[in-house]
Structures are given as C-alpha cells and as structure tokens.
C-alpha cells in the first residue's frame, strides 16, 4: 500500500491495509468490543506496518475523554511511591494515557491545588494517597467527574476503590520476629498519626506485644515523619531513654537510614547492641551494612492494581467499590540480629 509521504496515516488506511472495517480497527484500539484474535492481530500488524498513531486530541473531542490521569502522592522521592508510580505509568501507557504527577508533602493545601489542576486539565481519573486530614475535605471537592482510586490510605468507607497492603499483619509479623529473638523492649517509630498505614501498623505492634504478654509502654512509641530526618529524630528520642529499647521497628524504609545514623552517633552497634527492622524493601536495603531486615511491600503491584481498577471504573462508573489488600513478606537479614544466633 503506497501512501504519500506528506499525508498522515488515517484509521481508514489501517482498515484498508488489514482488509477490515474502520469499526473493527476502532474496537481493537479501544478494547471496547469483542474482535476475534485473528482479526485483532491483523489490525495490530497493520498499525505497526503503517506506523499509525491516533490523534488523541481529536479522538478525545469525539469521546469526551482527555486521555490523562493524575497520580498524587506525598513524596515521589520515597522509593515506595517511586515504584508505585512506575506500576501506574506502565498500565496507563498500555491504555494510551498520559500521567500527571503531583507531590503533596502531606499538605492538604498542596493537594487541593493539584486537584484543581486536574480539574482544569479535565483529567479522566485520579489515583491518590490522600493527606492525613483530608477525608471530609475530599467529599466536599468538585471532582465528581473523576474516576477515583485511593492507594496506601483507605477510603473504602467512602465508597472509593482502595489498594493497599495488610499493614496490621505486616507489623505484627515483624514484632513477633523480634520477640522470637528475645526482645521485650521494642521501640516503635511511627509516621504521621491519623493515616491508615500508621494506625494499622501501630495496631499490629500492640497486638503482637499483648499476644506475648508484654505490656505496651507509651514511652517506647515515638511519633515522627517518613523521611531520613524523621528516623533520626525518632530513634534519638528512644535511645535517650534511661531504660532504652533493645530493638527498633521503623514504619518506613527511609526512616531506617536515619535510625542507623543515630545508632552510630550514639556509639552503639547494629545489631550487636540494638536490633533494627523496618517496613519497605528496596535495592539498597540488601547492600547496606548491616543488611536490613524488612517487611516487603509489593509496591509495583500496588501501582498496577490501582491503575487496572481505575480503567475498570472508567468503563463502568456504577460498579460496586472494591478494596484490594495485598500481602507483605518478612525478609530476614542482618540488622535484626538473627544471624548472630
């Protein structure tokens, strides 16, 4: 099939090349009607052969979609959210969607500005890890046209699709592992209070202690924030206690780096003098000295699942909301002291 070099390839050209109707090409591209595998493959081969690229703007005018979705997270530099973003983007790209990314730093005002931006850009959907104080606030926002998915923070009680891990079980597993190693004074450094991950992990911590007959000591719980500096501050508070803990559990991987820095500055050794474990497993956790014992979260899968849910919601706005809870995994390395036994 010879085309003029100055003319753009059209959907009609693809249909002629594949010997199918324009409607069949459209169905294959939009994935909204059944097409036999043989015909679908023929269409895809013609699209590749002709280097056809759909005009998303023109298509959007016809279908009233923008081919844009938003992803709003507290901090994209946190590897937890970096991996989630990659999972979201891979699925979005497969659906020919672009991604608009925003960082809130847990600030409701910044969150509001990003939501207003998405409104102005007429985004079709939004995946969000809401700020600590924004549940009622979200209900009041003019975002009714957006398909909405919550990650890492539960909004299921508001009828919103949610994807997150079983934080309670993950924390309980970590604390029981430390107890099995002989620790009874286990310090906990939390993130911001009032958000689901913090509250659920705190509950898992207390459940594990109570199950083994260990009283919960409020002095062993330090409230901080999910950054390296937050880990330093929280660990410093706990190590300054007259009867300091023999083990620390950090609610975030970046906080564990800060904890290790504080342990070293205090003249202590990890794990010989104090054991350490944390949520989140990243590449550096396996190469640090000591290598970190972690509760691994399937971050890329969280991103994928949330994006899949979003596109399901775009196809069917009336379906019942779903909550997906993914499982965590304990990975035992050196920092907990298990290798010393």
Enumerate the predicted regions with their spans.
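Bacterial carbohydrate/catabolite-sensing allosteric modules
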Residues: 1-5, 49, 90-95, 119, ...
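Short beta->alpha connector loops
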Residues: 105-108, 129-134, 254
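Amphipathic helical "hinge" segments at domain boundaries
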Residues: 50-117, 121-125, 203-206, 210, ...
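Short catalytic-loop micro-motif centered on adjacent basic/acidic residues
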Residues: 100-102, 127-128, 188, 294-296
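Short acidic active-site motifs
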Residues: 56, 110-114, 136-137, 230, ...
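Short beta-strand segments enriched in small/hydrophobic residues
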Residues: 17, 22-26, 61-77, 177, ...
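N-terminal helix-turn-helix DNA-binding module of bacterial transcription factors
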Residues: 1-67
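Short gly/ser/thr-rich secondary-structure transition/capping motifs
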Residues: 5, 49-55, 109, 129-131, ...
């Amino acid at each position: 099939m010879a085309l003029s070099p100055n003319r753009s390839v059209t959907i009609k050209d693809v249909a002629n090349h594949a010997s199918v109707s324009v409607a069949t090409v459209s169905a294959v591209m939009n994935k909204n009607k059944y097409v036999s595998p043989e015909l679908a493959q023929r269409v895809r081969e013609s699209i590749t052969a002709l280097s056809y690229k759909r005009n998303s703007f023109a298509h959007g005018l016809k279908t009233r979609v923008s081919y844009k979705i938003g992803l709003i997270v507290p901090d994209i530099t946190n590897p937890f959210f970096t991996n989630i973003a990659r999972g979201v983007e891979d699925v979005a790209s497969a659906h020919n969607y672009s991604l608009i990314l925003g960082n809130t730093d847990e600030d409701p005002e910044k969150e509001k500005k990003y939501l207003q931006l998405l409104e102005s850009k007429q985004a079709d959907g939004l995946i969000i890890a809401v700020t600590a104080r924004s549940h009622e606030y979200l209900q009041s926002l003019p975002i009714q046209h957006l398909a909405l998915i919550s990650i890492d923070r539960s909004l299921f009680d508001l009828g919103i699709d949610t994807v997150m891990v079983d934080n309670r079980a993950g924390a309980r597993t970590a604390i029981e592992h430390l107890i099995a190693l002989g620790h009874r004074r286990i310090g906990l450094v939390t993130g911001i209070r009032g958000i689901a991950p913090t509250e659920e992990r705190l509950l898992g911590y207390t459940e594990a202690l109570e199950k083994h007959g260990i009283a919960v000591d409020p002095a062993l719980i330090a409230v901080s924030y999910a950054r390296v500096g937050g880990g330093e501050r929280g660990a410093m508070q706990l190590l300054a206690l007259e009867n300091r803990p023999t083990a620390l559990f950090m609610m975030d991987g970046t906080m564990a780096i800060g904890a290790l820095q504080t342990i070293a500055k205090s003249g202590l050794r990890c794990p010989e003098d104090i054991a350490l474990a944390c949520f989140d497993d990243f590449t550096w956790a396996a190469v640090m000295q000591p290598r970190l014992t972690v509760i691994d979260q399937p971050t890329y899968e969280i991103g994928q699942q949330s994006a899949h849910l979003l596109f399901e919601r775009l196809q069917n706005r009336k379906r019942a909301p779903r909550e997906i809870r993914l499982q965590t995994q304990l990975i035992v390395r050196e920092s907990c002291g298990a290798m010393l036994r």
